[in-house]
Structure formats: C-alpha cells, structure tokens
Amino acid sequence: MSLRKELAKEIQLLEGEMKELESKRMRSLSALMESLISKRDPEETEMQFFRQYTAEIEVKREKLIELTEKLKTLV
C-alpha cells in the first residue's frame, strides 16, 4: 500500500478516535456543568475523566497535525 494511502487511513482512524473521545468528554463536561448550575461540588471522578479525555484528545490532535503535514508533503 502506498504511503499516501497509509497516512490517509491513519488520519481517518485518528479522527474517529478523537470524535469518540470528544463525545465522552462532552458527557463529563455535562456532569461538571450540572454540578456548577446546582451549586454543588463536582464529583472527583468526573473531573478526572474530563482531564483524561482532554489530554488524550490533545495527543491525538498533535499526531493528526503531524500526519496531515506529512500527507501534504507527499501530494
């Protein structure tokens, strides 16, 4: 398989993974917002999940940028 096709496939996989992580992060964000609106302390686990998902998204976003740049140089 050509390098361009491999990069395009990997980019597509990363985008899917990021979309899934963003959905999970949105659920945690909703729980955190509910706590804020209800004027109560947020659950520690929700804060940890939010931070974890955010960190994973950032790592994948950096990888996506890197792969996209590589793909642009091949075109």
Task: Name each model feature, range by range.
Residues M1-S23, Q48-A55:
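Short, charge/polar-rich alpha-helical segments
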Residues S2, I57, L67-E69:
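Short, low-complexity interaction segments enriched in Ser/Thr/Pro/Gly
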Residues E10, S30-A31, T45, E66-E69:
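A periodicity- and composition-biased signal for non-globular, repetitive helical segments
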Residues E17, K24, A31, E56, ...:
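Interface faces of extended alpha-helical assemblies
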Residues K19-R51:
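Short E/K-rich amphipathic alpha-helical oligomerization segments
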Residues R61-V75:
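Long amphipathic alpha-helical coiled-coil segments
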